[in-house]
């Protein structure tokens, strides 16, 4: 089994990669082959000489495009990881501080995995910060949604994940053509997709 980890570190976010890599190598799916696909504006990073680290040149797009355009970045390079069993995007500033096993983490019956946003836990769905703009493709109506998910950790079986990033890339592109940016960028688009 092989797992692809998609990681964006441009600009100031490059400082996180060393600790990220060390913690994920030690604790995240320790018995499974992992490859880190690192989108970066640097020619070299700590551990970039490792066989399981693949640097992908990516200029710093600035705010909010560094997050908003991630689905386009991933789909542009999908040939690199399309044959992996699972693919996950994980935020640059995450650390894996305890052992996480395949049995605990990898979706088996489901195709995708997302994580509830800590700030939304236990909230009434009407109080969650879904995008409420009906012109936006991330729009969530007031009677929809029950859990608000974070944009910083998502993935699953690679085929299903690629389907998701293609859909979200297309929605973001269509919104941009209409002069619209979702409230919380990629996270708003992800929430709309997960709700259905």
State the predicted function of each range.
Residues 71-124:
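GT-A fold catalytic core of metal-dependent nucleotide-sugar glycosyltransferases
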Residues 122-132, 148-152:
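Conserved core of the sugar-phosphate nucleotidyltransferase
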Residues 142-196:
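Catalytic core and acceptor-binding pocket of nucleotide-sugar-dependent glycosyltransferases
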């Amino acid at each position: 089994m092989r797992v692809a980890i998609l990681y964006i570190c441009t600009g100031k976010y490059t400082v996180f990669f060393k600790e990220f890599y060390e913690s994920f190598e030690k604790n995240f799916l320790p018995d499974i082959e992992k490859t880190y696909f690192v989108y970066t504006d640097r020619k070299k990073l700590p551990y970039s000489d490792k066989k399981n680290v693949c640097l992908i040149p990516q200029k710093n797009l600035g705010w909010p495009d560094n997050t908003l355009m991630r689905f386009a970045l991933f789909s542009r390079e999908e040939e690199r990881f399309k044959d992996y069993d699972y693919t996950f995007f994980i935020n640059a500033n995450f650390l894996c501080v305890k052992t996480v096993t395949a049995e605990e983490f990898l979706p088996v019956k489901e195709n995708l995995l997302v994580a509830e946003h800590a700030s939304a836990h236990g909230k009434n769905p009407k109080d969650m910060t879904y995008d409420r703009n009906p012109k936006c493709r991330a729009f969530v109506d007031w009677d929809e949604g029950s859990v608000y998910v974070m944009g910083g950790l998502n993935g699953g079986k690679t085929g299903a994940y690629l389907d998701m990033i293609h859909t979200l890339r297309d929605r973001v592109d269509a919104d941009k053509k209409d002069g619209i940016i979702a409230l919380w960028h990629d996270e708003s688009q992800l929430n709309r997709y997960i709700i259905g």
